[in-house]
Amino acid sequence: METVQSIITEWTDPKSWEKLVQHSFKDSNWKELIDPVNYKFNFGVTPFSQFQIIPIVLVIYLVTIFSIKFLMKNRKPFSLKFISILHNAILCIWSLIMCVGVLYEIIKRVSNEGPLFTVCEDPNGGFDKGVTYYWSYIFYISKFYELLDTVIIVLKKKPLIFLHVYHHCKTVWWKKYITMIQILQFVCLGIAGVLHVYTINTIGCFTHYPAFAAAYSINFSFLFLFSKFFVKSYTPKNSNSNTNIKSKKID
């Protein structure tokens, strides 16, 4: 409850917004981006840690996207082939590094602390420091970089759909299986969530319920959206149109 109240106070206090405007990036501890062992999350010191950063970035993002879209209205699309390849390569390498880092740390801590480490939190705190939470923070930072996806799409004059990560041509055969894997991922996360709730209620360990509720609300929203996309794109009613598109491309 104290955390919720502090967030509300932070958002409604005009002085906090004034401090954010005056805040210089040189005041941030940028070493935290490359120091997982000594990582500790500190509001106002850890880069991009202010509550107001999110709405400000989103406003800039939306203004930028729709401005570019307006300017590109009567222009030819940019190819951006090399930039797209480089951007996707960076995302792949970044994701691989995060995956390896998280798996290594989880395996090490489960070996030392037992499997309940993955479910129960330390009631005395500690969720804001350490290697495990460093990778959570790096994942958060990656979301800012991923906003470039939409910029590239708009510059290439590709259609902007809600799930714009799937903006590529629907006739590419492997896209269907990627979507299926994504849906399976969200189903597995949902099952893990049920097991999580069962475990914490059975043994009575501490967990942060607001964070848990927020995380799984997002998970189920993605499950709904990806399932809707799959049904719309790959159900039999669209098979004829997809076949026609493929045949036209072959011709």
Swiss-Prot record:
It comes from the Eukaryota. Could be implicated in synthesis of very long chain fatty acids. Its main location: membrane. It is an enzyme of class 2 (transferase). It is found in: Membrane. Its EC number is 2.3.1.199. It catalyses: a very-long-chain acyl-CoA + malonyl-CoA + H(+) = a very-long-chain 3-oxoacyl-CoA + CO2 + CoA. PROSITE patterns: ELO (PS01188). It is a multi-pass membrane protein. Belongs to the ELO family. PANTHER family: ELONGATION OF FATTY ACIDS PROTEIN 1-RELATED, FATTY ACID ACYL TRANSFERASE-RELATED. One of its GO terms (molecular function) is fatty acid elongase activity. Keywords: Fatty acid biosynthesis, Fatty acid metabolism, Lipid biosynthesis, Lipid metabolism, Membrane, Transferase, Transmembrane, Transmembrane helix. The lineage of its organism: Eukaryota, Amoebozoa, Evosea, Eumycetozoa, Dictyostelia. One of its GO terms (cellular component) is endoplasmic reticulum membrane. The keyword Lipid metabolism applies. GO terms for biological process: fatty acid elongation, monounsaturated fatty acid; fatty acid elongation, polyunsaturated fatty acid; fatty acid elongation, saturated fatty acid; sphingolipid biosynthetic process; very long-chain fatty acid biosynthetic process. It comes from Dictyostelium discoideum (Social amoeba). This is Putative fatty acid elongase DDB_G0274669. The chain crosses the membrane at residues 51-71, 82-102, 135-155, 177-197, 211-231.
